[in-house]
């Protein structure tokens, strides 16, 4: 398993391996919920392909409050439409911002 900062940018749903990064998830939780703007109770919501008990890569996380995290898992397409979100684009934006932060550190 590789650390998130070492990953080259890729389209969100084509990540070849599962990446785990607690610092990245902690950073994601520092943002407001993308759906409602809440600042508290933010979770790093995994997006992208997953099945059974396996989560998608941490690099595919977005910040959502508990309520909207649960709603997203009930139907991603409907969720994106309802809140006018482009989840793959949000993931790419967050990944790019994280890489820039890591370069500056």
Predicted segment positions?
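Short linker/helix segments within small regulatory modules
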Residues: 48-61, 82
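Compositionally biased, intrinsically disordered low-complexity regions
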Residues: 39, 50-53, 77
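A boundary/linker detector
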Residues: 1-25, 30-32, 37-43, 59, ...
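Short Cys/His-centered divalent metal-binding micro-motifs
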Residues: 62-82
């Amino acid at each position: 398993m590789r650390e998130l900062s070492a990953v080259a940018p890729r389209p969100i749903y084509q990540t070849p391996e599962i990446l785990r990064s607690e610092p990245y998830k902690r950073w994601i939780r520092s943002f407001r919920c993308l759906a409602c703007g809440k600042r508290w109770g933010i979770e790093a919501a995994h997006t992208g392909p997953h099945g059974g008990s396996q989560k998608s890569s941490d690099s595919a996380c977005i910040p959502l409050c508990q309520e909207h995290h649960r709603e997203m898992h009930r139907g991603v397409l409907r969720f994106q439409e309802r809140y006018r979100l482009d989840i793959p684009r949000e993931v790419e934006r967050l990944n790019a911002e994280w890489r820039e932060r890591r370069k500056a550190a």
